[in-house]
Amino acid sequence: MHQLFAYLRFWLRSGNAHGLHSPFVFGLYTSVVRHTGTFAAYAAVEARRQQLLDSSASISVTDFGAGSHTGAGRQRRVAAIARTAAKPPQLAQLLFRLVNYFRPATVLELGTSLGLTTAYLAATDSRHRVITFEGCPNVAAVAHETFAALNLGNIEVIEGNIDHTLAPTLAALKAPLDFAFFDGNHRYEPTLHYFKLCLAHRTDESVFVFDDIHWSADMERAWENIKTHPEVMLTVDLFYIGLVFFRKNQPKQHFSLRV
């Protein structure tokens, strides 16, 4: 119910390309967000998605995040995870286009799940490095199968509670954090904690993407806090995700745009 009212509020205040006076945002919106073409990687990842949806296997799941609205228990079918936890094709492919557009060398993903979104993040360029975090070893094992099936060798999976693994992984980075997708814990405090940890490794050209910014009142509060952070110069609310930029040479701006 919260998401329904949140979407109605979003629809009333959001717009499209008409009236966009920022050349950067206009180009991003028309070339990436509203892009209607296809890429070769789409078919391969979606074929793997169908394999997971058809799977009869069950695994024991440990969830360190806010859980799901489905109320599913500890033992879960792989097909159910693919159906309810994996990002839908439209959103996962948007993330692919964002990475393809900005060409980051180092990509961080908080929340691997079965590896479908990770695969999209990695498939744009085999030369860039994707580091992804998954709390549950059994889920991570399925993700590894996904990467092997798609011949993706540029992905490193960090297993364990992100609260314990994120800081040391960031400390060991030998390059700036160019792109980060936050999908690991849909609660206020952890979201802001992960954001602040990653801030120390960003550049002015870094892109942070936050998933499910209207998922709950808690996540909306976190998003508002991120928007007003002094280092954040530009944010784009696409309802399902929020884009964060740190571009210094422009005034602070916020946009709400329909996908």
PLM features: what roles do these ranges have?
Residues 1-181, 185-207, 213-259:
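A short alpha-helical cap/connector motif
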